Amino acid sequence: ITYACTVNSDAAVVYGDSGNPNDVTLTWKRTNTEYYDTLTDDCHVYTYGIDLTKEFSDNNGNFDNVKFLLKNATDNYFVQAELNKSEGIYYVTGHTEKEADATKFSPMSGEVNHGKVMVKGLEDDSYIITEVATDAGYTLLKENITVDIVSSDSTTICSVCGKALKTASAKVNGKDVAMTEDNGSVSALVPLTITNTRGFDLPKTGGRG
């Protein structure tokens, strides 16, 4: 008997090292007995996010004109997500092989998460961020940005999920970055900043501090 589960991507999900418990109980009865057998198993499912900050060197750019694509480098698919405007967060909903059907991520331009592209619900894997549009007068990011997320349980089997796990880790363009917490769960988000100037683009890794 096998079973599968899907982790919804929304505010109820725990991102980072705390993980999401996935418990299953199987109860069955043999025809020649009067009692039931029960088997219980549990595992933790981990999911992560990207916290991208977009900046213009002169602070005059229009975030609404900026678009990014997010692609899974391992399986060669584009990420699809739905924006929760009140939270200023994109929650992953699926994926597609067609670029035309991919979500184009824009930085928030209101009071919530201003200048940020916050994407939650990513599995541990390698991703490619491509800037496909920017405000008039600014140059597109010339090179893609690679984000690698390594899960805290990548070497741990489900039956021993209860033991202490190593913290998740991340790299941006091959350089280690310190993942940030989310609602008390550490190693939840990969921070990076992209700054566009009118003459050239300067990607920066890591967060503020």
Name the predicted role of every residue range.
Residues 1-209:
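Solvent-exposed loop/turn and edge beta-strand elements of beta-rich ligand-binding domains
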